[in-house]
Amino acid sequence: MSTTKTTKMTVKTGSKGTSGRVVRVTGPVVDVEFPHGFVPELFNALNAKTTFSSLAKTLTLEVAQHLGDNLVRTISLQPTDGLVRGVEVTDTGNSISVPVGEGVKGHVFNALGYCLDEPGYGDEFEHWSIHRKPPSFEELEPRTEMLETGLKVVDLLTPYVRGGKIALFGGAGVGKTVLIQEMINRIARNFGGTSVFAGVGERTREGNDLWVELQEVNVLKDTALVFGQMDEPPGTRMRVALSALTMAEWFRDEASQDVLLFIDNIFRFTQAGSEVSTLLGRMPSAVGYQPTLADEMGELQERITSTRGRSITSMQAVYVPADDYTDPAPATTFAHLDATTELSRSVFAKGIFPAVDPLASSSTILDPGIVGEEHYRVAQEVIRILQRYKDLQDIIAILGIDELSEEDKQLVNRARRIERFLSQNMMAAEQFTGQPGSTVPVKETIDAFDRLCKGEFDHVPEQAFFLIGGLDDLTKKAESLGAKL
């Protein structure tokens, strides 16, 4: 019996400085041929020098696929205008890296780590790769702790987890970005923490407004900003969240700080991944999204976590396409969240800000074992009253409020006061309302809503509860309307 001897062919992966040449350009997708046996590894950054409109520029390409025959398919992180076949491409030998350290605070960077407000700044800093492994199971923090925000509706009904992942869901124009700006202000002013903001595929104007506003309220010095706005190629929009997360990881792991990571908007991360997937020729999955949607989302979300004594708390704005929560993009995000704050168009239409829907929002730590028995009891009573009010809406619309029982009439009046008391004057809206933002301690919030649910404020006019802070504000406004608490 004869035996056939098989031999393995070893392929030497690319090393730093190896040069190839462009053989195909299709929008942001660039195919590059390398010498035999010197193929760059996946996620390696390649540099291509080109000229467009008499200006020389260097493009950064990221290896996405090995096609065989010494060809790699890459995604460009800059516009490929002027790039032609035959252009020399150099393998850097490393993946994309960004500057880290205390020096990144107070500055704006792009996905590649280049400083936008001060060109050349940060080049000498230590750089970390944006592709990193999440902390091991042994490093994770087992303790669960509440993050106090000073916003009544959040602290009472959807308490945030320190080191958790929090999402702001909502359609277009209901206040997701404003609420994120509010949280940056509150964390910097009240807690002195470090914030990292990732602008993923949103409007350039919003980024500029945020930059100016953070300067005005003197919190820019504690915030690092990383932008990849909606006019950028999909490769940039897909990587900018990882760049910001890498900066946040340095503050957690090396500086032992609690960090807040803001991502606006996580849907654009998914959208960019879908565009890249299509460009790479992958078969689309449900509703046209990429087949690797859950994997890509998991790679990002698993790195956002608490290690022992240190945390990254993430707030992510999630655009909901056509207000459809069954869309795969928001649905995939749900699986990773500790708290959800849903911003509702119907609440927004009532002029209640922040426009949080208290019945649709939720938190995994609204549990008596974590927030305490009293907090849990008051929150459940508020939810019960608001749910009953919602159930009565059809009867009120058809027959009128006079047809309700005396008990239900009392409950409706109480629910309307609760709805208005859940609104609050915000720091981010001071220039529009002329009112300074207010911060309400959790204990005061619980006490105020407990008394409200028991009917102690039934005699106070509804408008006294609108856009105010705590009990002191309520007392002043009630007295101005001729009522006493």
Swiss-Prot record:
Residue span of region Disordered: 1-20
A Pfam family hit: ATP-synt_VA_C
Compartments where found: Cell membrane
Transport as UniProt keyword: yes
Residues reported in the UniProt entry to bind ATP: G170, G171, A172, G173, V174, G175, K176, T177
Lineage: Bacteria, Bacillati, Actinomycetota, Actinomycetes, Mycobacteriales
Molecular function as annotated in GO: ATP binding; ATP hydrolysis activity; proton-transporting ATP synthase activity, rotational mechanism
InterPro entries xrefs: AAA+_ATPase (IPR003593), ATP-synt_VA_C (IPR055190), ATP_synth_F1_bsu (IPR005722), ATPase_a/bsu_AS (IPR020003), ATPase_alpha/beta_chains (IPR050053), ATPase_F1/V1/A1_a/bsu_N (IPR004100), ATPase_F1/V1/A1_a/bsu_N_sf (IPR036121), ATPase_F1/V1/A1_a/bsu_nucl-bd (IPR000194)
Name of the protein described by the UniProt record: ATP synthase subunit beta
Family per similarity comment: Belongs to the ATPase alpha/beta chains family.
Extent of the signal sequence: none
Membrane-protein topology: Peripheral membrane protein
Enzyme class, UniProt record, top EC level: translocase
EC number from the UniProt entry: 7.1.2.2
Keywords in alphabetical order: ATP synthesis, ATP-binding, Cell membrane, CF(1), Hydrogen ion transport, Ion transport, Membrane, Nucleotide-binding, Translocase, Transport
General function of this protein: Produces ATP from ADP in the presence of a proton gradient across the membrane. The catalytic sites are hosted primarily by the beta subunits.
Subunit organization: F-type ATPases have 2 components, CF(1) - the catalytic core - and CF(0) - the membrane proton channel. CF(1) has five subunits: alpha(3), beta(3), gamma(1), delta(1), epsilon(1). CF(0) has three main subunits: a(1), b(2) and c(9-12). The alpha and beta chains form an alternating ring which encloses part of the gamma chain. CF(1) is attached to CF(0) by a central stalk formed by the gamma and epsilon chains, while a peripheral stalk is formed by the delta and b chains.
SMART domains, A to Z: AAA (SM00382)
One GO cellular component term: proton-transporting ATP synthase complex
Catalyzed reactions: ATP + H2O + 4 H(+)(in) = ADP + phosphate + 5 H(+)(out)
Gene3D superfamilies: 2.40.10.170, Bovine Mitochondrial F1-atpase, Atp Synthase Beta Chain, Chain D, domain 3, P-loop containing nucleotide triphosphate hydrolases
